[in-house]
Amino acid sequence: MAAPPEPGEPEERKSLKLLGFLDVENTPCARHSILYGSLGSVVAGFGHFLFTSRIRRSCDVGVGGFILVTLGCWFHCRYNYAKQRIQERIAREEIKKKILYEGTHLDPERKHNGSSSN
């Protein structure tokens, strides 16, 4: 049995890796995609079985449902994640410009306020 870590030491956790290379805990969107894909495979496979009573074909439909739902969720989530990162970067750059130019003769707000008062 391993000794508990001391209060000052960080606790080491093993991360869950899927297929040996996809770190589910640290990769954005991976966990949700896998969970929704699993649910999609169960629904697709079981639904197909209820309609047709063909076991092998239902398993194939379940695997196909897993692949489609997982990839669909993955691409949707990664697209939104990338879009959010771009918006954050643009906002960060604008804040830096605002801080840099505030109160100087290069401040765009100062030019607008100065020209409207004349």
Swiss-Prot record:
Transmembrane segments: 34-51, 61-77
Topology class, membrane: Multi-pass membrane protein
Outcome following mutation: T52P: In MC4DN11; reduced protein expression; defective mitochondrial respiratory chain complex IV assembly; decreased interaction with MT-CO2/COX2; increased interaction with TMEM177
Keywords per UniProt: Acetylation, Disease variant, Membrane, Mitochondrion, Mitochondrion inner membrane, Primary mitochondrial disease, Transmembrane, Transmembrane helix
Any Gene Ontology biological process: mitochondrial cytochrome c oxidase assembly
GO CC, alphabetical: mitochondrial inner membrane; mitochondrion
Keyword Transit peptide: no
Modified sites of kind N-acetylalanine: A2
Mitochondrial intermembrane side: 2-33, 78-118
Membrane side Mitochondrial matrix: residue ranges: 52-60
Subunit note: Found in a complex with TMEM177, COA6, MT-CO2/COX2, COX18, SCO1 and SCO2. Interacts with SCO1, SCO2 and COA6 in a MT-CO2/COX2- and COX18-dependent manner. Interacts with COX18 in a MT-CO2/COX2-dependent manner. Interacts with MT-CO2/COX2. Interacts with TMEM177.
Disease: Mitochondrial complex IV deficiency, nuclear type 11: An autosomal recessive mitochondrial disorder with onset in childhood or adolescence. MC4DN11 is characterized by walking difficulties, cerebellar ataxia, dystonia, choreoathetotic movements and dysarthria. Additional features may include sensory axonal neuropathy, cerebellar atrophy, and mild speech delay. Cognitive function is normal. Serum lactate levels are increased. Patient tissues show decreased levels and activity of mitochondrial respiratory complex IV.
Official protein name in the record: Cytochrome c oxidase assembly protein COX20, mitochondrial
Organism: Homo sapiens
Gene: COX20
